[in-house]
A protein has these predicted regions:
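Acidic-and-aromatic substrate-binding clefts and catalytic sites of carbohydrate-active enzymes
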Residues: 61-63, 88-90, 226-227
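Divalent-metal coordination cores built from histidine and acidic residues
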Residues: 69-174
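N-terminal metal-binding scaffold of metallo-dependent hydrolase/deaminase domains
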Residues: 1-40
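Di-metal (Zn2+ and/or Mg2+/Mn2+) metal-binding site signature of metallo-dependent hydrolases
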Residues: 45-69
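Active-site regions of enzymes building and remodeling cell-envelope glycoconjugates
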Residues: 39-45, 196
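Active-site neighborhood of phospho(di)ester-bond hydrolases with catalytic His/Asp-centered motifs
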Residues: 48-55, 82-85, 113, 148-150, ...
Length: 242
């Protein structure tokens, strides 16, 4: 059995930067890639960097993070960017801390954010509510990497004081702010982006995506088990490779 820290892999190496594939061997020492050698090898499988799922709610899988990781990694996913707002709406900060601690049990990278919508709407009964103190605590944690999706996009567009306070706290902690604003274009997209929102995974049309890109947002093309936007947006790759 190979050491987890020292081993080599041979096969077809996929170079994502040069957009090429070549035969060779990757040498790992102390858990770090030390060198890559182009050479003829008998192995014919493909070696490429692990995938990062840039938007997923672990709780939707009905699995705890450590068990989710065991299933995801065999399909090439080695990391996720995850908003734990489902457990946060039930258990609050304790729920988020559980997700972090459980995820730390496996060699899989979970990048958790501070849930922006607890509760998700003012019309439901949730198990917990986040106020300014909770947002300060979460965004002050090194394990929390960003302010999770700002789903109350009408509130952001209309500069609702509480929505803007969340954004202010994130900025004070130098944390980026994820978006969630389906269908907005033109002036609404501009106002949303100007509030400090950096990403959006909720685009349905090319116009919507292009408007958001124009105002400085990064667009994530979603092709999930429910919402599927790949066909509508894939042409973005021709002019916006980054």
């Amino acid at each position: 059995m190979k050491s987890r820290q020292n081993f080599s892999l041979s096969g077809n190496i996929v170079d994502l930067i040069a957009n090429s594939i070549f035969k060779g061997t990757v040498y790992i020492e102390d858990g770090i890639i030390r060198k890559i050698v182009k050479q003829e090898v008998k192995e014919d499988h493909y070696i490429l960097p692990g995938l990062i799922d840039s938007h997923i709610h672990i709780e939707s899988s009905m699995l705890i993070p450590s068990e989710f990781a065991k299933l995801a990694v065999v399909h090439g996913t080695v990391a996720t960017v995850s908003d734990p707002h489902e457990i946060a709406n039930v258990l609050g900060i304790d729920g988020i801390k559980y997700m972090i601690s459980n995820g730390n049990k496996v060699p899989f990278k979970f990048y958790f954010g501070a849930s922006a919508c607890v509760p998700a709407t003012p019309f439901e009964t949730s198990g917990f509510q986040f106020h300014e103190a909770e947002m300060e605590e979460l965004l002050g944690m090194k394990e929390i990497k960003y302010l999770s999706e700002m789903m109350n996009f009408p509130g952001v567009i209309n500069r609702d004081p509480w929505e803007m306070k969340k954004i202010e706290i994130a900025r004070n902690h130098n944390k980026p702010i994820d978006g969630h604003a389906p269908g907005i274009t033109s002036d609404d997209a501009r106002k949303y982006a100007e509030a400090g929102i950096t990403t959006d995974h909720e685009c349905f049309s090319m116009k919507e995506a292009l408007d958001k890109i124009e105002y400085g947002m990064k667009i994530q093309i979603r092709e999930g088990s429910a919402a599927k936007n790949f066909d509508a947006l894939i042409d973005l790759m021709q002019e916006h490779e980054d």
